């Protein structure tokens, strides 16, 4: 249905379900691990010694990454309308980017004649206790509405 809908409207964006390979797959894996670590850190009751050990491990891998070459080519685009490809990647997006440890990430799909977004917002996205921060909800809605606009071809 997504192909039919996007070809009808000349959309700029459709999801790419091709599994990443190589460095890009490793970047996705690292981002997922950092996301999980952040979520656990937000509400842990671990002892001081355990927290210090975790901090040392994080400092170690941060130093290791700091030694690696910097300035990787951008694998994505800020806006779908300038991507030039209907299967552009958005790995760096703070909302849908699978390569960004800050992203929940929100997964978007075309279902019938509408767009759906699915995400699990962990403790890192909490505003009022037990609730997602309104700014995070707004950012997620911006992505859903952006995809909707992109599918319109306008």
Language-model-derived ranges and their functions:
Residues 1-154:
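Terminal targeting signals and extreme-terminal segments of soluble enzymes
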């Amino acid at each position: 249905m997504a192909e039919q809908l996007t070809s009808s409207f000349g959309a700029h964006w459709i999801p790419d379900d091709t599994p990443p390979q190589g460095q890009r797959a490793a970047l996705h894996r690292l981002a997922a691990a950092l996301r999980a670590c952040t979520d656990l850190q937000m509400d842990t009751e671990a002892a001081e010694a355990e927290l210090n050990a975790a901090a040392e491990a994080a400092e170690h891998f941060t130093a290791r990454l700091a030694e690696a070459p910097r300035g990787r080519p951008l694998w994505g685009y800020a806006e779908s309308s300038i991507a030039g490809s209907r299967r552009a990647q958005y790995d760096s997006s703070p909302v849908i980017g699978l390569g960004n440890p800050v992203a929940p990430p929100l997964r978007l799909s075309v279902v019938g004649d509408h767009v759906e977004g699915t995400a699990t917002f962990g403790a890192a996205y909490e505003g009022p206790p037990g609730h997602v921060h309104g700014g995070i909800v707004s950012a997620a809605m911006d992505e859903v509405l952006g995809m909707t606009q992109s599918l319109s071809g306008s």
